[in-house]
Amino acid sequence: MEKQKKESGDVPDQQAVRTWYKGLLDRVVREMLKSGAVQGAAVEARPVWVYPEQVLIARVWSAAQKSQFIWAIAGEGVVIDHIAGSLAADAREAAKHFSLKWQMDADRLVRTVREKPALGHAVAQIEEYSKKLVAGAEMLYRLTEREDIWKHKLPA
């Protein structure tokens, strides 16, 4: 997606941001249903924080169990993933949790490849995915360190 900016400078076009995160939110809901992270005939989701065209953090829940939400993350620079809602009080804490989780997942994958050389052709795919996890974790961690970007309101 081409980044659209207002004439005033670095502020992303609010309509473009809204279109971007709504499309991504639909994809997140489909993935959470497919993976079994949420279940039910009616699933709801609410975007909580976005870093435009890079990262979306949302709450996703079954309409029947609204108090049992999960934090979900998706975007250009990160994998689609989720954690239990109880693991973070807000989107920033969720981002920190995802960052740590992905570092640990990447380490575990690298260890698996070293311990099981018989994985053959899958080694390259595992290593590539591990690198993607680390890159996403590092990017997300850098974002959590920036005070300014956590105060923005989502475009309605």
Where would I find each of the regions flagged by the language model?
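Short aromatic-glycine-(Arg/Gly/Cys) micro-motifs in beta-strand/loop hairpins
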Residues: 50-83
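Acidic, proline/glycine-rich low-complexity IDRs
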Residues: 2-5, 107, 111-156
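Hydrophobic, Leu/Ile/Phe/Ala-enriched alpha-helical segments that form helix-helix packing faces
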Residues: 24-36, 98, 102, 140, ...
